[in-house]
Amino acid sequence: MISSYHRPTRALIDLEAIANNVKSVQEHIPSDKKTFAVVKANAYGHGAVEVSKYIESIVDGFCVSNLDEAIELRQAGIVKMILVLGVVMPEQVILAKNENITLTVASLEWLRLCQTSAVDLSGLEVHIKVDSGMGRIGVRQLDEGNKLISELGESGASVKGIFTHFATADEADNCKFNQQLTFFKDFISGLDNCPDLVHASNSATSLWHSETIFNAVRLGVVMYGLNPSGTDLDLPYPINPALSLESELVHVKQLHDGSQVGYGATYQVTGDEFVGTVPIGYADGWTRDMQGFSVIVNGELCEIIGRVSMDQMTIRLPQKYTIGTKVTLIGQQGSCNITTTDVAQKRQTINYEVLCLLSDRIPRYY
């Protein structure tokens, strides 16, 4: 998708804020723990290449979702370890090896497919994924884990690490978290040959369960300055959001009593109202359910009226403003502030999703 540089809608990314957030977490965990930056999904909408280049010197490696994301980083000049968290199909192993990309092995069946297809695993670096209770990919049985580690070694692969992922580390109720932690500890202790690198800590675990860190943390949404729990748990120390979203008024008109606005004519003007048009819509990830939410114009909250269209939305203005007046959708303007979590609450979703849905049509400026 082509970024729309010739319209005034843009995302502003503060790379220094991201670096400072990483350092803040590092200051609150033991100094001997490794830090992996999670830059999947285009670094949660912030720009994977730009973010990775900026923080490469202060982290020990990177985590991505799939092989294409990993290759993008390698081609951009990133040299540190890149772990693909998802499953890469056997026929793509040679490509991963050629790019020195570390793969996740989540089942003995995957290894059997490699053997059946005569895939050369020699020199491949892998981490074993353990399903401690998330229910997605990963090994559940200790016997399978031991066989995997043994047979991968015999095949010439290098088993560098083993990891799991917590489902509820961002919740106040620790019951499920403790169950998973116990499962993973028992699994690790039962291995005949445990890999050197053991990691289970995501953003939430690094914030609220730092005492359970093994020897590495995977920093995701916290790196971008967002609370993984939304509003459920207070942050133990400050972090700063790295992304703001802004646009400009491209059209302003006065509508009179009874006039209707937008698809479905869902908004009806009462009295005389100034209505401004902003060039952002659901094709940009600013979804239709944002009707009734507010944005900031001239330091004041202005309601989104009518349905959000594919490319545009309309807002009610307290007075006539000129074309080109700044509109803040996420971020600070004057004394008003709209956070990504505010947007998420309006949509009844999580702040992660808000950022990841911001499409490539919106150019990122650093």
Swiss-Prot record:
Modified residues (N6-(pyridoxal phosphate)lysine): K40
Pathway where it operates: Amino-acid biosynthesis; D-alanine biosynthesis; D-alanine from L-alanine: step 1/1
Pfam family, one: Ala_racemase_C
Enzyme Commission identifier(s): 5.1.1.1
GO cellular component: cytosol
Database matches in PROSITE patterns: ALANINE_RACEMASE
Active-site residue list: K40, Y263
Binding sites annotated in the UniProt record for substrate: R136, M310
GO molecular function per UniProt: alanine racemase activity; pyridoxal phosphate binding
Any GO BP annotation: D-alanine biosynthetic process
Cofactor(s) listed: pyridoxal 5'-phosphate
Keywords: Isomerase, Pyridoxal phosphate
Catalysed conversion reaction: L-alanine = D-alanine
Role according to the record: Catalyzes the interconversion of L-alanine and D-alanine. May also act on other amino acids.
Family: Belongs to the alanine racemase family.
Name of the featured protein: Alanine racemase
The organism of origin for this protein: Streptococcus agalactiae serotype V (strain ATCC BAA-611 / 2603 V/R)
Gene (UniProt): alr
